[in-house]
Design a protein with these regions (language model features):
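C-terminal catalytic domain of Rieske-type non-heme iron oxygenases
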Residues: 74-269
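Rieske [2Fe-2S] iron-sulfur-binding domain
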Residues: 1-87
Length: 269
């Protein structure tokens, strides 16, 4: 009620918490009903103000994850999130899970997948990827990017490793690693914006149970080592609404045309 951030921790303490069916503020311990947004408890008040209310956001649960929709103009969500067999079936298990505070945006992180040239300078590929080897298609909220692995280690493998990336909006991304004999691991990336320049990214890596102790662990180690070099660049880069692109940059323009639907037009000016 006095402007505290319900997601960020306060100094020496924790952030907002779910308490029963309410969200508890870390600043004054007010409780807000999760369905209506109405204040239902103030520990030091005799009477709850009638207008004590915060906005309630559309929420769905998928595979143990709570996903919240935040539309650019306050609109309701126009699509649903997929149900993944890796979540709900018995064949796969979680090998790795982590949450990282980043000074970045969901837009920048997604654009990393189609910024082909940086895989040489930042990640150590020996040759620049060919744009024609990466396919990108979109329909509504969904974007599909498929192409060879961008990891230098993949060049040493005895098989061709293909990354199949599926975006469902900007905050829910799956990456399937195709071509590995006997398994197709899955990486789920979910991103929660905290403000215009900061977010929390959660990485969940699934492998089928038969290979979890071998391929799953190996891929997890290589995956995080491959992402770490991007962090300082994301932290210090600025958003360029109309970048000057060359023919070897990759499908950045196509990615941005798809991503515009999730932002107000003022964000691109």
């Amino acid at each position: 009620h006095l402007g505290a951030h319900l997601a960020r921790p306060i100094t020496g303490g924790e952030g907002g918490k779910v308490d029963g069916d309410a969200l508890r503020c870390p600043f004054h311990d007010w409780r807000w009903d999760g369905e209506t947004g109405k204040c239902v408890y103030i520990p030091y008040a005799k009477r709850i103000p009638e207008n004590a209310r915060t906005r309630a956001w559309p929420v769905v649960e998928r595979g143990g994850l709570i996903m919240v929709w935040h539309g650019p103009e306050g609109e309701e969500p126009g699509f649903d999130l997929p149900t993944l067999e890796e979540f709900d079936g018995d064949a796969y298990t979680v090998v790795y899970r982590n949450a990282v505070d980043q000074k970045s945006t969901p837009l920048d992180m997604g654009e990393n997948s189609v910024d082909l040239a940086h895989f040489v300078t930042v990640h150590g590929l020996t040759e620049y990827p060919k744009p024609e080897d990466t396919t990108i298609t979109s329909e509504g909220e969904r974007l599909c990017i498929s192409g060879p692995s961008d990891s230098p280690r993949a060049q040493e493998l005895p098989f061709d490793l293909v990354l199949d990336r599926q975006f469902f909006g900007l905050g829910f991304v799956t990456i399937r690693f195709l071509g590995i004999p006997g398994t197709n691991p899955l990486l789920l990336i979910t991103t929660t914006p905290l403000d215009e320049r900061n977010c929390v990214t959660r990485w969940t890596f699934f492998a089928n149970k038969e290979t979890a102790d071998t391929i799953g662990v190996m891929f997890t180690e290589q995956l995080m080592q491959g992402v770490i070099p991007d962090f300082p660049i994301w932290e210090h880069k600025v958003f360029v609404p109309r970048p000057i692109l060359c023919d070897g940059d990759g499908p950045i323009a196509e990615y941005r045309r798809w991503a515009r639907q999730f932002y107000p037009e003022s964000a691109w000016s």
